[in-house]
């Protein structure tokens, strides 16, 4: 008996989802049907593909080898089908996009109308999360994140690079004075992140050339909240340029310690599961973001 594409699809979905129940939900199948198909596949192959416990699933050595091949086969099948249909296909359907709130407000929302005019049959669903998420569990097609890619199960498309700006409002500086060095920040009300703590080591360099670690007077979980605190005169913040450049241009915020601030950039990427790469609505959205953000954000 030969293995069929349904068996490959179900097996790969079980592994990527981490459970039979989540795979069944993703595939719109009964739990019993998913379990039965995987068992049938194991019987055909004559090996156990999964270690089953009451708490979690894990791949056997044979299962890991088979999963890699099955995943590639399904990707090639989907790519071949998409290529045949792409000539006549119109991008359509719901595209679920997750990003931190500052990116939603300052990058995605301003581009939504232009994207809708170009692709009127795609319905964007924008949700906000500050940390890393499980795309499958959250039913998200694509996430926009800062930093390097850690999860080998994901693919990334580079969108743009950003630099940090140390900024404060004119009102704050008029009241508290303007720091002339990283060390002088110790005498000011610095605005920092609740977590991760690494974001409270700023890009401004001290006399020894080391990034300066602040002791925050106020903390918040989002860069957007810190921006609001900064605009209201609560203190000094260090935020990504795309978040504050308009405020600087309008005179609402003043850049500080420019000569002591590192010009090192940090990347922003779109991340998604590799089997989504052939999804036409995802592909055109990625191309759109690269075109718009790559051209308009110079870091």
Curated annotation (Swiss-Prot):
Coiled coil, from the record: none
Domain (HTH lysR-type) ranges: 1-60
DNA-binding region, residue intervals: 20-39
GO biological process: DNA-templated transcription
Induction note: Expression is transiently induced upon contact with target cells. Negatively autoregulated.
Single Gene Ontology MF annotation: sequence-specific DNA binding
UniProt free text on domains: The N-terminal region is directly involved in DNA binding through a helix-turn-helix motif. The C-terminal region is also involved in DNA binding, probably by permitting the oligomerization of the protein. The C-terminal region interacts with RNA polymerase.
Known role: Involved in the regulation of bacterial adhesion to host epithelial cells. May play a central regulatory role in meningococcal adhesion, particularly in switching from initial adhesion to intimate adhesion by downregulating the bacterial surface structures that hinder this adhesion. During intimate adhesion, negatively regulates the expression of pilC1, encoding a pilus-associated protein, pilE, encoding the pilin, and sia genes, encoding the capsule. Also negatively regulates its own expression. May also regulate other genes that are involved in intimate adhesion.
Subunit structure of this chain's protein: Forms oligomers. Oligomerization is required for DNA binding.
Protein name: HTH-type transcriptional regulator CrgA
